[in-house]
Amino acid sequence: MKPGEEIAVSNGVDGKEYRCGIEEFLDGEVRCTLRFIKEDGVELPSHIYLFQGLPKADKMELIVQKCVELGVFEIIPVATKRAVVKLDEKKARSKTERWQGIAEAAAKQSKRGIIPQVTMPVSFAEAVKRASSMDLSLIPYEMAEDGMSLTRELIESARPGMDIAVFIGPEGGFEQEEINLALENDIRPIT
């Protein structure tokens, strides 16, 4: 890089891309001048919150990476009844820090305007409580009765600016008790 070249800068929070011209290099720093702000970056028009059932082994790392690359706004690991993985407080904190690092790297790699947050794991009940306040909450469930027509209708109802919760279960799926709790809180089952 040299003076006169243009660089793209992001604060990782507001989704904007700041285009700057390099002015000079001083004592390990780069002085730039803001040229313009690109408001319509690569972020999705809605915020997608992934409530991910804890998977076996290190599969969560790949899930975090790919979901960040695809545009997910926040990832909430969820301890479900059928989850094989059981994390104590210390392990949960360590894993969350690792997952957050993966989210940051994936956001930079895919030139995201924000760095999605990976929260500490929560119980299924806590996840349902949080998701129930969102504009649209969906839970894929193999026994959903309304089929693909309702699934299409719900997905097509998503609008810019909405907060959308998507639940994904662990390898064994969700217990009927968990599905019932989701239904009681207006989380819609889809196929």
Where are the regions a protein language model picked out?
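Gly/Ser/Thr-rich beta-alpha loop segments that engage phosphate groups in nucleotides
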Residues: 6, 55, 171-175
